[in-house]
Amino acid sequence: MGVGGTSASDTALSLCPTAPEWPPRNGSSGRAWGGPLQSGAPINSTDPLGPQLEPPGGGPATADPTVGCMGCSGEGAASSVPPVPDAAQDPRLGVTGPTDGDGGVVALGSPEEVGSGEQPTRAGVGPTEGLTPRPPGLPSPGLGLSSPGPNLGLPSLDLPNPNLGLPDPNLGLPNPSLGLPSPGPTPDRPIPNPNPSLDLPDPGLAIQTPNLGLSNPNIPLPSPSPGPGTEPDLLPVAEDSEVSMELPQPSSSPAPAQRARGRTDRTWLGAPEPISAAPGTAEPPEIIDVDYYDVFDGGHGPGGGHGAGGAAQREPGGAATPWGLHELYDDFTPFDEADFYPTTSFYAEGDDDAEEELEEDEEEEEEEDGGLEDENGYRPPASAAPRVPPPPSPTEGTPMARPRPGERAVPENSSECRSGYVRHNSSCRSVCDLVPSYCHNGGQCYLVESHGAFCRCNTQDYTWHKGTRCEAIVTDFQVLCVAVGSAALVLLLLFMLTVFFAKKLYLLKTENSKLRKTKYRTPSELHNDNFSLSTIAEGSHPNDDPGAPHKLQDPLKPGLKDEEPLSILSTAPEEGSKGEPGGCGVPCLHNNLG
């Protein structure tokens, strides 16, 4: 190129930005054709106005609307000419654009809004004066790699596909070290087409240019667009570097692309457009693995316990651990008396048989316990599917429920215990060993085949007992108290009967004595005695009737008269014997009377 538009080389290549997939936002159409039609597409008889694009091979210019600079504004305007590459320093090309006399460097993504002025905005803020595209194939400094170019202090982004028509710096252009801007297009100086074989991009594409968060907010950099049809990424250039780039600024008119050839769709670099991510294929929701944890396992809840991670936890050795032993624990439950009813046939078995059976059971338990590991060393692995939480284990110290006599024990974990044995620590142990006080009041616990545990009560200290576990007893003292009490009751009853009959007998004797004292003779007996005595004493005749009524009227007098004759009779023999030895006296008189 020449300075001021006098360069003999008019075949300089221009780098035109690709158009987006949607119509321009200002809704304007190009009006670069002469004739009466100021809007719309040209007709065959209309001659084009302004510069024509020429292919790189030196062919003739064409008026095809699909070929040319897209988005350029009016003819002769500095903002309507696409940026021209300038290979001044190295393969990292600087892009310059014509201005009204100033070859200022324009930064992509300038904070100046679209349509704010006719002149390009310089990117001279801070240590960086311009932006230059990074050659393809270089690693991005954002990934921890540095750019091989000189004076590059800011991170750069990857360039798009090089098939976009980026000109080769070795095309015989003038020395780009001059850093002069390209003159504006004139009717006698057409702008050549950099790549006639370049097809227009798909209108469905978009360019997103967000702010990359640099230290200086006035120099935003566009985001990488690795796909074809996108703008090349630019790298910041140091202030002392001669490689510069100029871009046309949008016009303040509502139609900045008027009188432009070809399609006028243009994407302004300063206006970032969000790109919506294509919705992916709807996937079914993932199955969330849920694992339960138990506070007794020493776990710390989800995320820190046994169920965290969804993977099976392993021991330090690396082997997966089985389920925790706490799930196999079945501590004791209260014993039910109705579960066991021994018979007297158990007494026939000797103590030796029971002791031998206990020894055999202990040996079996030791063999089973030999293959088990310590309870504290187990870590239950997390299952892939949710599992039902185990039922809360009963508290320790309570006896386990034992099966009823004659029934087989319920199998646990594909194993079962015989009658009289319970599962403890994943092994079968006898009830007599686990519960030392299974039999009360000094009873002895025995294991009977097919019947379970049996209690033999202490018959030496106690006379009677009751219950399957000797819980009810009767002592000798109790028997003695019952016997003494019964005897006392019988004696008391006999005493009461004796007293009763003795009193009755006493009353009978008293009444009988009274009857004897109050008994008198009858009047007839008294008359007969008085008559005989009176007649004998007085010498009266027994046939004396006048004296009879008088005796009946006075019954008390015969008593006195009776005593007098008795006394006379008792003294008469003595007097007769003394006075008259030969006479018989009163007895003789009685005999004579008789």
From Swiss-Prot:
Compositional bias (Gly residues): 298-310
Keywords: Cell membrane, Developmental protein, Differentiation, Disulfide bond, EGF-like domain, Glycoprotein, Growth regulation, Membrane, Neurogenesis, Proteoglycan, Signal, Transmembrane, Transmembrane helix
PTM field: Different forms exist: the 140 kDa form (also reported as 130 kDa), which probably consists of the entire protein, and the 38 and 80 kDa forms, which are probably cleaved in their N-terminus. Increase in synaptic activity, results in shedding of the extracellular domain and expression at the cell surface of a 38 kDa form. A form of 200 kDa has also been reported, which is probably hyperglycosylated.
Listed Pro residues bias regions: 182-195, 219-229
Region annotation (Disordered) ranges: 1-325, 343-418, 535-594
Domain called EGF-like: residue spans: 429-471
Ranges of Low complexity composition bias in the record: 140-181, 248-259
Residue ranges of the TM segments: 482-502
Extracellular side: 19-481
GO biological process, any: nervous system development
One Gene Ontology CC term in the entry: synapse
Compartments, record wording: Cell membrane
Pfam families the UniProt entry points to: Chon_Sulph_att (PF06566), Neural_ProG_Cyt (PF06567)
Chief site of localization: membrane
Task of the protein: May function as a growth and differentiation factor involved in neuritogenesis and more particularly in neurite extension.
Subunit: Binds TNC and TNR. The 80 kDa form but not the 140 kDa form can bind TNC and TNR when expressed at the cell surface.
Protein name as catalogued: Chondroitin sulfate proteoglycan 5
